[in-house]
Amino acid sequence: MISLESQVLQRHLSFFEHKSVLFAGGINDQFPQQVPARSVKVWSWYFDYAKSKSAVDFSLTCEEKADLMVFYWTKNKQEVQFQLMQLLAQAPIGQEMLIVGENRCGVRSVEKMLDAYGDIAKIDSARRCGLYHFCLKNTPHFALADYWKTYQHPRLGDLRIYSLPGVFSANELDVGTDLLLSTLDQPVRGKVLDLGCGAGVIGAYIKQQYPQVELTMADIHALALASSQRTLAENQLEAEVIASDVFSNVAGKFDLIISNPPFHDGIDTAYRAVSELIMQAKWHLVPGGELRIVANAFLPYPDLLDQHFGSHCVLAKTTKFKVYSVRG
């Protein structure tokens, strides 16, 4: 099964023949293995995709060169711009690129984004997607330092949060995390796992308040991991930061697993990651250990929590969010 975007690309296989090809962006299927190219590589920011594929580079930056670059558009325009500018800044004049994306994700805006850097034209429209061909004429400037954002918040004391584009809670402390942090009114001890750490807000806050904890922070997103690492470093805090698809790369058991888990996948609502978190958490908790999560009040997590833990407590709630606690 391949994505709608890949189904559109499948109509244009002649572009790939006898070329070295680099796939990037939001690709999430097996299409790269099907193209009639001389060589194929993939650059992905998503560990859940990269961990199960060969020839996939999971990293913040990419230095690969290719005759043809193929970019899968995602909903987050800032993340798209970050990755496109990085790719084109190191490419030679005349670099060929295909950009494909769903119309509902805003792929049309690629024309305005890339117009100043070369020739771009729409060459196909199908499966509610657009496919664009681009040829580089003017090399864009790219500096990683230009993309960092930082903020502080009264809830966080003197912590300063650092984040890159596309990372959750990148520009300000979100309401759900604020509510979750408000429930940390009792000392935190032992081993702590911040799952889906984003820019590192939750883990850094706990480590600042309770320096003795042994902290692990995990996320699937390369930009989130880089953001958490910088948030820790800039605040002189230490923790282990790992790439993991929920618990796929997590070892050991914890006294506290804490999370503001994602419930959006692109522009769709997805429960896979949260369902896995709840279903598998008991195997990663010490006896009596706690799982504490914040979630939109309308999401059906109480039933999942009760199914796997027997019961749950609501530690705090607003009209939009609830903080749930269960113990192993």
From Swiss-Prot:
GO MF annotations, alphabetized: 16S rRNA (guanine(1207)-N(2))-methyltransferase activity; nucleic acid binding
EC number: 2.1.1.172
Transmembrane segments: none
Enzyme class, spelled out: transferase
UniProt cross-references to Pfam families, sorted A to Z: MTS, MTS_N
Primary localization: cytoplasm
One GO CC term on file: cytoplasm
Quaternary context: Monomer.
Name the UniProt record assigns to this protein: Ribosomal RNA small subunit methyltransferase C
Species name: Pasteurella multocida (strain Pm70)
Lineage: Bacteria, Pseudomonadati, Pseudomonadota, Gammaproteobacteria, Pasteurellales
